[in-house]
């Protein structure tokens, strides 16, 4: 329902103590509600089912759809904590290769389905939230596309997939003596693809403060084919 690992969630006693401190400070009664479970979430029925050719990496399960409904702004966290999810994606896809991304986008294009790319889900501006309207929505989660494909030590450049999280990216570069040296506040829970499309910056991204200072080329799969910036 918020940032971080489920295992790091404060215990009920810690939340209750925090509520007491806040209440005393502001002179109001503050109650720490229990964290909701996925069993409490009620979503509308999915408005589409993935075709058989895509079923191996697509799902309409409640947990997946709920988890891809919001980003991580305060408003998003509150709505999710209250199980207020009126507009979830109808399907979540986890492509494992470029060909599967192409297949998903072709299906979306032919079926008039909205495709929403999803990296780490750390957006605080509604970037991963499904748009309203009658069209079905597929959230395309890129977590499986998380590898450094190639490193050129001479030019100090690397080919990297969009779905890699910050720590995993650094872990793959470090054995070669390299670092991307881009550390936004969302570093642990955001992806390279998300950094690029939002022109990521932040308090911990110093000197060259935006990710586009480091980008030499982008290869992108679109509904009309593959596009490369150079």
Question: Can you annotate each of these PLM segments?
Answer:
Residues 1-230:
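Noncatalytic alpha-helical scaffold of FAD-dependent oxidoreductases
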């Amino acid at each position: 329902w918020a940032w971080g690992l489920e295992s790091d969630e404060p215990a009920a006693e810690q939340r209750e103590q925090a509520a007491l401190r806040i209440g005393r400070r502001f002179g109001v009664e503050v109650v720490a509600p229990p964290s909701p479970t996925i069993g409490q979430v009620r979503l509308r029925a999915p408005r589409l089912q993935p075709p058989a050719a895509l079923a191996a990496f697509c799902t309409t399960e409640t947990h997946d759809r709920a988890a891809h409904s919001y980003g991580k702004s305060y408003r998003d966290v509150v709505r999710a904590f209250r199980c207020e999810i009126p507009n979830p994606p109808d399907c979540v896809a986890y492509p494992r290769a470029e060909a599967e991304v192409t297949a998903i986008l072709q299906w979306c294009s032919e079926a008039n389905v909205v495709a929403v790319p999803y990296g780490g889900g750390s957006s605080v501006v509604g970037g991963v939230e499904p748009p309203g309207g009658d069209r079905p929505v597929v959230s395309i989660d890129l977590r499986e596309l998380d590898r450094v494909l190639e490193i050129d030590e001479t030019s100090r450049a690397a080919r990297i997939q969009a779905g890699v999280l910050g720590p995993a990216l650094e872990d793959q570069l470090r054995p070669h003596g390299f670092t991307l040296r881009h550390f936004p506040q969302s570093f642990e829970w955001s992806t390279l693809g998300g950094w690029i499309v939002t022109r990521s910056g932040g308090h911990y991204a110093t000197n060259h403060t935006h990710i586009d200072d480091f980008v030499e080329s982008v290869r992108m799969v679109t509904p009309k084919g593959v596009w490369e910036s150079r």
